[in-house]
Amino acid sequence: MKGAIAALFLIVSSTFGQSAKSALMKPSALKEKAPAMYTAKFETTAGVFQVEVHTDWAPNGADRFYNLVKNGYYDGCRFFRVVPGFIVQFGINGDPAIQRNWESATIPDEPVKQGNTRGTITFAKTSAPNSRTTQVFINFKDNSGLNRTGFAPFGKIISGMDVVDKIYSAYGERPEQARIQTEGTAYLAKSFPKLDYIKKATIEK
């Protein structure tokens, strides 16, 4: 009986996992509108922190983040760029097949309504217009210079900033984003084994 239950659990888990991956393979289908305010919980190898998102700060960013968290995109993602006194960045999926589908799934830029103060979370972008996709960063300190270059925060850490502060930082900016995108978690696990990562991210309310 126990064996049958265990087998059923494995089948259900496998089916759920395949369903989640299937959803993440189609960015254009994940366009649910986020609530005016919501909380996302991040369970990581460093501990737990919570993000309170304010959709009116940056609607495009808030909607994208909501869909990514809700559909498990950030689960397993490493904190690959950690610069003490500046930011901690994450959001490249560990599965290259999924990552490829999101590289061109950009969202429009929007005005900076809330400053990049300590504990705020913001989508990363390049110098090109409308280049935000999945990568986000949390500000370790007040980074007002980012306000002038169009980085629009969409939320803030409401608990667990002490956890964010202790995310492993010794590798700095050494992990190569291009290799993470093409090789995924395998590259990071082999070359940067001490990186902290997200075990599970969920929408709480």
Regions found by a protein language model. Name each.
Residues 8-9, 141:
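A ubiquitous, low-specificity "background" feature that marks scattered single residues
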Residues 16-205:
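Cyclophilin-like peptidyl-prolyl cis-trans isomerases
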Residues 1-7:
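Sec-dependent signal peptide recognition
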Residues 9-17:
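Hydrophobic h-region of N-terminal signal peptides that target proteins for export
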